[in-house]
Every structure is written in structure tokens, then in C-alpha cells.
């Protein structure tokens, strides 16, 4: 019986973990702020339903990352796939919103985005690592910065739906940045 421990990936995961967990947590918070901001376009009931779907999908993604068959995969690969799934979801949301579709069409993209962000966050934080003060501070600052940036882009880029699309494009970019960071850390560890 042999036991294989991939120490290189664990070291790279520690280095990437704070930035990745901050990105994985700040993007859904910014998406939630955008959903609340687009309440005038969608209606308060639809905005609250989409916000609830986002929260449930994020929690579902975090639970999915704890699933035994997925825990056997390398952590950096799971982190990358979580970010890529989230980017696909936010891009689908962006396309549906830009296409002028009503709120039920946004549901699939928001669910995929939240699911991917939940997987990425749970993978980045890890099983037993407690949040340190610096980690918490980095996460809070990132959440505020991404939320403010998304709301400023939505407000000043273009009024109405187009501003929301630009702000969602920012979230897609940040999610792809997380996937790229995971891939670079994975290549450095190999």
C-alpha cells in the first residue's frame, strides 16, 4: 500500500489560498449587490428570488466541494474548475441580461455562477484552516473593493441594463483571474 501526498500542490495552495478565497467570496457578494441594484429593472420580487438562488447555489457549491469523489482531486484543479464554472455562469447571466430576457432566463446563469464560486471558495479555504485576522481583513477589503467597483461601473458606464452588463463583465473577468491564478499555482507546483 502506498500513500501519495502532493506537497507541491499544498504549498502552492497555501500561497494562492488567500487571494483565491477573497475572489471567490467577493464576486458573489458583488453579484448580489448588482441584483439589488437592478431591482428597478427586474422588480423587487424577481431580484429577491435571484438573490436567494445565488445564496443557495453558493451554499450548494460549498457542499459539493466537500463531496468525497471531488475531494480526491487536486485542490488547485478543483479551484480552477470552480472558477471556470462560475465564469460560465456569469457569462450566461450577462448574455441573458444583455439580450433583454426576463428574470427566469437569468436563473440558470446565476445558479451556475453561485455553484462555481461556492466550489472555489470551499476549495480555497480548505477543510481545517481557520480564518486568520489577515485572511479576514483581505477578504473584507476585497469584497468591498469588488462591490464598489461593480456598482461604480454599473452606475457610470451606462445607465440601465447596459451598465449592469458592464458590471457583470467585470465579475466574469475577476472570476477568470481566479482560474488563471489557480492554473499558474498549479504549474508552479508541478
Spans of model-derived segments:
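A late C-terminal transmembrane helix in Major Facilitator Superfamily
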Residues: 133-151
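Helix-to-loop junctions at the C-terminal end of transmembrane segments
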Residues: 61-74
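Hydrophobic core of transmembrane alpha-helices in multi-pass small-molecule transporters
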Residues: 102-119
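Short amphipathic helix-loop junctions that connect adjacent transmembrane helices
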Residues: 27-46
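Structural signature of the two symmetry-related core transmembrane helices
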Residues: 77-91
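Intracellular juxtamembrane helix-capping segments at the cytosolic ends
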Residues: 117-129
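Pair of pore-lining "gating" transmembrane helices in MFS-fold secondary transporters
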Residues: 8-33, 111
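A membrane-interface helix-boundary motif in multi-pass transporters
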Residues: 103, 151-172
